[in-house]
Amino acid sequence: MKRLFIYYSQSGNGDLVAETLQAQGFDVRKVTPKKKPPKSFLLQILSGGFAAGVGRREPLADYDADVSDYDEVVIGSPVWNARLSCPINTVLALTDLKDKKPAFVLYAGSGTAPKAEKKLSERFPGARVIVLAEPKKYPEELKKLGDL
C-alpha cells in the first residue's frame, strides 16, 4: 500500500511529523505558500488566525495535487484559530481525495482542535483525525502516529 503525507509547517512541528511518517514508509510532500508569512510572530498569529477563521485559501508554490498513485493520503496541518491552516485549505480544494483513505494529523498548541475535527468529520466521514500537542515541545506526542 502506497501512503502519502502532505503537510504544511510554519514552526517545525509538521516537519517532525513528516520525519516520523517518512520513517514509517510514507512519501512526503511539504506545501509552501507563494507569499512569505509576516516576520513578527504576533502578526503571524493575528493574520493567520483571522484568515483561517474565515476559511481563506492561500496560493501555493509548485503544489502537485496528483495523488492517484497512492492508496492512503494523510494531511498535516497546524491549527490556527481552532481551524485548519490556510495552505491546507488550498490543498483540500485542489486535491481529489475521492476513493482514498484520508486521515489528518493536526498539531495544536493546546493539544485539542474540536472545531477543526468537527469540520473534517463532516467533510470526510469516517476519516481518522489525530491531534498532537506541539511535537517540538512534547516529542512523546509523536507516538500517536503509530496508529496510522
Name what the model sees in each region.
Residues 128-148:
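Glycine-rich phosphate/pyrophosphate-binding loop and the adjoining helix
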Residues 78-81, 109:
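Short glycine-rich anion-binding loops that position phosphate/pyrophosphate groups of nucleotides
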Residues 110-123:
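Glycine-rich, charge-decorated loop segments at or immediately adjacent to ligand/cofactor-binding or catalytic sites
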Residues 37-42, 114-115, 136-142:
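Short, charged, surface-exposed secondary-structure boundary motifs
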Residues 1-73, 82, 86-89, 93, ...:
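N-terminal beta1-alpha1-beta2 submodule of the flavodoxin-like/Rossmannoid cofactor-binding fold
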Residues 106-112, 135:
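Short beta-alpha junction loops
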